């Protein structure tokens, strides 16, 4: 395990963007597999579980080409924007991250997955907006504390990995609201009632 960790750190030093992007893609795909297993368990335990490989590939691809690179550049930019150490710097970084970056990143993620799911068409803007606000509210229950830990304890070169590990669980939630047909039907029924 120590050799594997050393290899990862070496790749991180020599190829930071590629390493972070691939790690994020792997962990987002893992989160989606877990989300699918949980969705199956809560819906219909009698039928045999069948993994949706396209959905896993979509989440992994979004991690590699969207989330990983975005986080790499975001954390670098945040360190340039807010310099120094101490509690006030950590709080400033967390607030900027959560009030500016998080809504844009979540909206971007949902736009990309919506675009992929609907074969190039963006559908139902009103439902998209409701789901975005819902996701941002849930985000604020999890990520402020996670980011305080990230900005205070995690070395800058490992922040994307840390966020990606936390994102296994966060990705399960985003995957669920992006792909689960029953979730979309429940939201549409709430509109009608």
Swiss-Prot record:
Keyword Membrane in the entry? The reply is: yes
What are the protein's UniProt keywords?
Membrane, Transmembrane, Transmembrane helix
Any Pfam family the entry gives: Mpv17_PMP22
What InterPro entries is this protein classified in? Mpv17_PMP22
- Which cystines does this chain contain? none
- Specify where it is mainly localized: membrane
Spans traversing the lipid bilayer = 56-78, 96-116, 132-152, 160-180
**Membrane topology reported for the UniProt record:** Multi-pass membrane protein
User: According to its UniProt record, where is this protein located?
Assistant: Membrane
Gene Ontology CC: cytoplasm; membrane; mitochondrion
Regarding protein family, the annotation reads: Belongs to the peroxisomal membrane protein PXMP2/4 family.
Q: What is this protein called?
A: PXMP2/4 family protein 2
Q: Which organism is it from?
A: Dictyostelium discoideum (Social amoeba)
């Amino acid at each position: 395990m120590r050799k594997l960790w050393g290899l990862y750190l070496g790749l991180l030093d020599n190829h930071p963007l590629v390493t972070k992007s691939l790690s994020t893609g792997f962990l987002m795909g893992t989160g989606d597999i877990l989300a699918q297993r949980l969705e199956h368990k809560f819906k219909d335990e009698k039928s045999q579980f069948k993994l949706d490989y396209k959905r896993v590939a979509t989440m992994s691809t979004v991690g590699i080409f969207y989330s990983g690179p975005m986080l790499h550049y975001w954390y670098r930019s945040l360190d340039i924007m807010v310099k120094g150490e101490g509690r006030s710097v950590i709080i400033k970084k967390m607030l900027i991250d959560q009030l500016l970056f998080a809504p844009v990143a979540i909206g971007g993620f949902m736009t990309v997955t919506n675009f992929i799911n609907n074969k190039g068409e963006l559908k139902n803007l009103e439902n998209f907006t409701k789901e975005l606000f819902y996701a941002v509210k849930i985000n604020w229950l999890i990520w402020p504390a996670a980011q305080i830990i990230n900005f205070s304890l995690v070395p800058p070169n490992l922040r994307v990995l840390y966020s990606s590990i936390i994102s296994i669980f966060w990705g399960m939630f985003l995957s669920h609201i992006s792909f689960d047909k029953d979730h979309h039907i429940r939201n549409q029924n709430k509109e009608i009632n």
